[in-house]
Curated annotation (Swiss-Prot):
Misc remark: Partially overlaps DIT2.
Membrane topology value: Multi-pass membrane protein
Subcellular location: Membrane
Bilayer-spanning residue ranges: 66-86, 120-140
Record-level GO cellular component terms: membrane
Protein's UniProt name: Putative uncharacterized protein YDR401W
Organism: Saccharomyces cerevisiae (strain ATCC 204508 / S288c)
Keyword terms of this UniProt record: Membrane, Transmembrane, Transmembrane helix
Length: 187
């Protein structure tokens, strides 16, 4: 459920597209009265589908099929499947041989054998270190995409770039922090 909530948070915080329009003319600007951003619960499914369909239209064939909506949807779905396949291998169909029974009283409780890392000769048994690494990679991917697109847009408009502006990848840092606390708590 945590990963599902992460996607919801991603859609909620990454739709801060003040005054921007999708390629199909879909307006993601703020409310007329309060001037607050529209979150994922205010954006209808039809608007999202129109924006996604327009990003893959033939007139976009010579450039990557990205707009802010499809980009963050892609990264949110990628993050979800990576986290499930790495931290929950039995759900993704991967064969997990890292489960051995641990006898407690009269019942057997499965115990996970987490991978060990030996940086500088120090052995670390890390339950979620590999998950943290994947989170860092996703943060770099999202940050790199946002940085390059903001620079390109600023160059086209003759303005200075605002790297993370209104599309800060909040959910990656939220998920990374949660896994960090979980990792430290299990040590």
């Amino acid at each position: 459920m945590f990963y599902i909530y992460s996607i919801i948070f991603s859609l909620n915080f990454n739709f801060k597209l003040r005054g921007q329009r999708g390629p199909a003319g879909v307006n993601f600007s703020s409310h007329s009265g309060s001037r607050l951003h529209r979150n994922c619960f205010n954006i209808s499914a039809k608007e999202i589908l129109i924006s996604v369909r327009a990003s893959f239209s033939p007139r976009h064939a010579l450039r990557p099929p990205w707009n802010p909506v499809t980009a963050h949807l892609f990264f949110a779905i990628l993050q979800f499947f990576l986290m499930v396949s790495i931290s929950e291998p039995h759900l993704s169909g991967l064969k997990s041989s890292a489960v051995v029974p641990q006898v407690l009283g009269s019942c057997e409780v499965p115990k996970l054998l987490y991978p060990t890392y030996t940086p500088l000769g120090i052995t670390i048994s890390a339950p979620n270190l590999h998950v943290l690494v994947v989170h860092l990679l996703i943060i770099v991917l999202k940050g790199g995409y946002i940085l390059t697109t903001s620079k390109r847009k600023a160059f086209n408009k003759g303005k200075s770039a605002k790297p993370f502006g209104s599309v800060m990848p909040f959910t990656s840092f939220l998920s990374f922090s949660c896994h960090s606390f979980e990792y430290l708590a299990r040590r």
